[in-house]
Amino acid sequence: MKRKLLSLVLSVAMVATMLTGCGNSASSGSAQKVGVAMPTKDLQRWNQDGSNMEAQLKAAGYAVDLQYASNDIATQVSQIENMINSGCKLLVIASIDGDSLGTVLEQAKEKKIPVIAYDRLIMNSDAVSYYATFDNYMVGTKQGEYIKQKLDLDNAAGPFNIEITTGDPGDNNARYFYGGAMDVLKPYIDAGKLVVKSGQIDFETVATANWSTETAQSRMDAIICKLCRRNKVRRLPLL
């Protein structure tokens, strides 16, 4: 939580610095408008990040166009396009799919609108000015260490059944989360203390498109019904 707060504060600080550097200080006449594009309202962290960023920017004297895209890529593209055309001087974007914004961000680049990629890396575009994030690999190792501690893997007899799910394959963060967690857990999988009965371990197999909780649940339900009816299951959190 502290790291996400730090990332948020740094994003707000970058907004102020970039607008001032462009001669767009909020104190010079009417308030300059910042577009903030968040992926969804379905997860509390995005609600908190969006509302906190909006509050801090407004407190600093900027107008804010805050939009949530319901995890729909086309909706987010449309929202960003509207922000560009409605006079936003800077964009802060937490992308749904980091590979899908190249075309719309070309419009921002043509209008010389700076772009901050917030928490999720935007790829296939040279329109991004800054990337505000934190140590995502360490987040993954923390998740793995939590499971290691709770199951007492160094001392308990085991074996423990476990199934793995991770985030969107187009989100650079998901690969770091997965890598960090698996670097902690894989030695126990190789030793047989953790058993992945489905055999589904590699990133591409366990990835969840668009971080969809419904897709992740559907996959886990299918695995549990097929393989784990007679066994107790320990689930990894969505990485």
Task: Describe every region a protein language model picked out.
Residues 2-8, 22-239:
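A residue-level marker of the well-folded mature domains of exported/periplasmic proteins
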Residues 11-13:
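Repetitive helical segments and hydrophobic/amphipathic motifs
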